[in-house]
């Protein structure tokens, strides 16, 4: 083991759903010069799936160690016989499940396996065995078929990492970002009809603070001392138009949160009318948007940065980033999937 290896952060890259493009994009990035220069890739998932995908795609595959072997290693070390990366064999399908497995067709079995690889990676991060988690795309319906109650990665991370209790207001927030635009969501995977009732000033203040702190750290890492420029979107058309198109959410919830956050020194615009918040002129003067619900932030982000955006969970005691796309079952194991979002997620994950 070299001194260079000792200083490389260990990145747990989870497979995602085995039937989707997750195995492919992990295999196509693990030995790239960019990834190798930034960290030590640990591919968390079923080794049999990785090897089968590598054979079909004609690409290289790292060596394999079991999860138990990895956890038995000293936390600061990496396998000396695998200096470029390794598969941590976990989240396994049974022999019978492997026999009936078909790329592009998810199942309860692939849902259970992807869930297990994520929980193993979370536990490894919490215990200090890895420095960050980069998650591959899961199939939420497969999780549901497997009897898993969490609607997605973010809720699972919040619960398992000890940052929130299921059913209570979460301490974590979802941020989607690219070099073009960054959005933090106040609410995540809930029906649109429930959004207004879930908004409250205290939670929104935390969201604004997390958004500002994230941009501030990233600016500092890039050698910039410029303060973050934050925009907070309104909930309603035209930000409520002084109550004409709203039930006073802007006046009673959003404005008080903005005023409270300004007391912490943040530079904030808002509440902005959502239909004009993302124009080119606005984006030039805004570093990060705080959005009230899922599609308010993700529609502009995916329209502008579909192939190279990254999902970052804010407020966790560990670092977690993710690709900002789904499993793309129609492209699975064909060598056609873009790796840009995975590369961006790895860049954001490096401490």
From Swiss-Prot:
Keyword annotations: Cytoplasm, Metal-binding, NAD, NADP, Oxidoreductase, Pyridoxine biosynthesis
Localisation: Cytoplasm
Gene Ontology molecular functions: 4-hydroxythreonine-4-phosphate dehydrogenase activity; metal ion binding; NAD binding
Documented EC number(s): 1.1.1.262
Cofactors required: a divalent metal cation
GO biological process, one term: pyridoxine biosynthetic process
GO CC annotation terms, alphabetical: cytoplasm
Binding site for a divalent metal cation: 189, 238, 294
First-level EC class: oxidoreductase
Cofactor note: Binds 1 divalent metal cation per subunit.
Classification via Pfam families: PdxA (PF04166)
NAD among keywords: yes
UniProt entry tagged with the keyword Ribosomal protein: no
Biological pathway: Cofactor biosynthesis; pyridoxine 5'-phosphate biosynthesis; pyridoxine 5'-phosphate from D-erythrose 4-phosphate: step 4/5
Residue sites binding substrate per the record: 153-154, 302, 311, 320
Protein family membership: Belongs to the PdxA family.
Misc remark: The active site is located at the dimer interface.
Protein name, UniProt field: 4-hydroxythreonine-4-phosphate dehydrogenase
Species the sequence originates in: Rhodopirellula baltica (strain DSM 10527 / NCIMB 13988 / SH1)
Phylogenetic classification of the source organism: Bacteria, Pseudomonadati, Planctomycetota, Planctomycetia, Pirellulales
